[in-house]
Amino acid sequence: MALHLRSSFSSKSTLLNILRHNLGFGSRSHVTRHIRQILPHDPPLRGSQNPISRLCNTMAEPETLSSFVQHEYANNHQVMDFPGGKVAFTPEIQFISESDKERVPCYRVLDDNGQLITNSQFVQVSEEVAVKIYSDMVTLQIMDNIFYEAQRQGRLSFYATAIGEEAINIASAAALTPQDVIFPQYREPGVLLWRGFTLQEFANQCFGNKSDYGKGRQMPVHYGSNKLNYFTVSATIATQLPNAVGAAYSLKMDKKDACAVTYFGDGGTSEGDFHAALNIAAVMEAPVLFICRNNGWAISTPTSDQFRSDGVVVKGRAYGIRSIRVDGNDALAMYSAVHTAREMAIREQRPILIEALTYRVGHHSTSDDSTRYRSAGEIEWWNKARNPLSRFRTWIESNGWWSDKTESDLRSRIKKEMLEALRVAEKTEKPNLQNMFSDVYDVPPSNLREQELLVRQTINSHPQDYPSDVPL
């Protein structure tokens, strides 16, 4: 400690400055308040009511002041050796603010009109990758519209679209490698599409026919592909997050040049699995990307009714996780953020949280009518003003990589392929009833065989109550 003391001091101002400098107080008023606390509580001498004046009267010699400063310096610079690091003490009652004065900014590269923002930082994208990103976004939109209408016609039992969130799906997938393991929710079919899942495979799953990899045992849009490192969707919210952390830690142990990636919505952050996953990922330093689609709604619950924090991005810091907020309707920003986050997660062996701000243009699912809790005008505004497809198309057109004819040809081809996939899937035979009881035990136990027998007897007794197209 360096004590900057003069041989004498002639004013209260001098003493205040000396104490403030050497004891580390933020202001002279803090020094005065501290002196009031440490001085004896005997009645002061006449004419010496001010605490600084009283202190001056007790310190006629510089040595006395030096001893006082050293003593107080030691008291004010003690620290607590606590697990995780040293913790400083403060003599003041200080509460951490519930939020920063300004909200965390949102990273974007393209403005609402698809124009490149001046001095924006982004990862360069080749023509081939950019064209595939846009083509897959268009494909996903067409697939969603056709499947949605098929459900409304009674041909599918259920469906949930990703309309308005295509950029999060496709651009994030483009920034990953096939070795990265995906733990999705039910609104990430675009990630699977990017990896090579065919329209026919999507249709087979939605119809639950015998060509479906899940053998008809899952709801529509609950896709999965072992070949493409895409774990099967679970309808239960946020259960995929702890799974992703475990997979990431496994990749770390095996020293793989890959990471785990999990997707979830803003509603998922209200589940305990979200908090458990972030905490263990930070503690174990697992290379996992947490990608949150904050689309404003958890079915009918707006984010304002879910949390009081500044969205989701600040929750990462609470768990010691590096985080970023991104414009989820800007494909170029999503690609750049995920590409950078992936490299960081693998190189530094750490989790990363990405909050992608977007808007759910479609209903939550075919079981929902969102116009009962939000206005049609709000939906229309987002669909036009911040449409992820039109913004990215403007950018690739400005680079000379796209044209109206290319657009027309693509939409015509995808619609034709999608309708054919729908026709084939609908006519393909359903899985055998026996598949309800297989693929769990190597040798089915007696109680499971009894259940299968009971189901068959019930169907034979009441055939009118069961689908006639399921082979027995």
UniProtKB/Swiss-Prot annotation:
UniProt cofactor(s)? thiamine diphosphate
Q: Which GO terms label this protein's molecular function in UniProt?
A: 3-methyl-2-oxobutanoate dehydrogenase (2-methylpropanoyl-transferring) activity; metal ion binding
SUPFAM superfamilies, per this entry? Answer: Thiamin diphosphate-binding fold (THDP-binding)
Any one Gene Ontology cellular component term annotated for this protein: mitochondrion
Residues engaged in binding thiamine diphosphate: Q185, Y186, R187
Q: Recorded E.C. number(s)?
A: 1.2.4.4
In terms of Gene3D superfamilies, this protein maps to: 3.40.50.970
Predominant location category: mitochondrion
Question: Where is it localised?
Answer: Mitochondrion matrix
Q: Which CDD domains match?
A: TPP_E1_PDC_ADC_BCADC (cd02000)
InterPro entries to which the protein is assigned, alphabetical: Alpha-ketoacid_DH_E1_comp (IPR050771), DH_E1 (IPR001017), THDP-binding (IPR029061)
Q: How does it assemble?
A: Heterotetramer of alpha and beta chains.
Q: What is the name of the protein in this document?
A: 2-oxoisovalerate dehydrogenase subunit alpha 2, mitochondrial
